[in-house]
Amino acid sequence: MTIVYLYTALCTVGGADRSIIQKANYLADEMHQDVFIITDSQKERPPVFPISPRIRHIDIGIDFDRQYHHNLLVRGYYYFTLMHLYRKKLEYWLKTLKPDIVISTLGRELDFLTQLDDGSVKIGESHIAKPYTRNLHLMEQRGFPYKQIARHWRKKQEEAVKKLDALVVLTQHDADN
């Protein structure tokens, strides 16, 4: 079985990075599955936690950080341009690898993941409580127009999650809501 994890970057000393790597290592070393971790913004930084030599790490090299140094209009242009590039690159890798299962940590790819026709089962895996996904709570605090954008993205995220084949959440409260 081929399993692909999708994550932004494995470069922070955080629970999500550690959890993803531990699960991937277990699946590769103990369960003898073919495991790939695809990141979008690793930027040649080494992973903080050790990755099994049986795992293939692919960074598709999109620097989403470069959008943050501009005004809202330019930032929007960068975001959609980078998302288009991300979709093309991720689609290429999923069609090349032909995974049986793709596990998303509900990052940017959630916007289009279920639209990719690669034949895989799509699973969402949340490593933070629902109100804090994609830092939308911070945008909501900034006032108009950020609050409207955050509401739109939250609604879009909830619709996308419903299209996944399965969803693993952090808390019982998230499961109930």
Question: Which functions belong to the PLM regions below?
Answer:
Residues T2, Q33-F36, V121, D165-A166:
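Residues at the starts of beta-strands that form the adenosine-phosphate
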Residues Y5-V13, Y26, M31-G76, D174:
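N-terminal strand-loop element at the rim of the active site
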Residues D17-Q22:
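A conserved mid-protein helix/loop that constitutes part of the nucleotide-sugar donor-binding site
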Residues K88-K95, K130, Y146-L167:
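Membrane-proximal helix-turn-helix segments that form the acceptor-binding/catalytic region
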Residues L90-E109, V121-I123:
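Short N-terminal targeting/anchoring amphipathic segment
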Residues I101-I103, L116-L136, K147, V168:
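Active-site proximal beta-strand in glycosyltransferases
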Residues L116-D117, K162-K163, A175-N177:
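Helix-loop-beta element that forms the nucleotide-linked donor phosphate-binding surface
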